[in-house]
């Protein structure tokens, strides 16, 4: 089974997306995604 990590909105702190974990990467994933709670596109960071 694939481990999943959550992507947390940098503005409101809600965890809106889950993506497969990247075991060979030390740095955390950052993507610009739409946050339905903020109503705009914000940076979402990987949480562990």
UniProtKB/Swiss-Prot annotation:
GO biological process, one term: translation
UniProt cross-references to InterPro entries, sorted A to Z: Ribosomal_bL33 (IPR001705), Ribosomal_bL33_sf (IPR038584), Ribosomal_zn-bd (IPR011332)
Record's keyword terms, sorted: Ribonucleoprotein, Ribosomal protein
Pfam family for this entry, one: Ribosomal_L33
Domain of life the protein comes from: Bacteria
A GO term, aspect molecular function: structural constituent of ribosome
GO cellular component, one term: ribosome
Entry's family note: Belongs to the bacterial ribosomal protein bL33 family.
UniProt name for this protein: Large ribosomal subunit protein bL33A
Species of origin: Limosilactobacillus fermentum (strain NBRC 3956 / LMG 18251)
Gene for this chain: rpmG1
């Amino acid at each position: 089974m694939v481990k999943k990590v959550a992507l947390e909105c940098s503005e409101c702190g809600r965890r809106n997306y889950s993506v497969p974990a990247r075991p060979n990467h030390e740095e955390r994933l950052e993507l610009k995604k739409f946050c339905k709670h903020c109503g705009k596109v914000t940076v979402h960071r990987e949480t562990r």
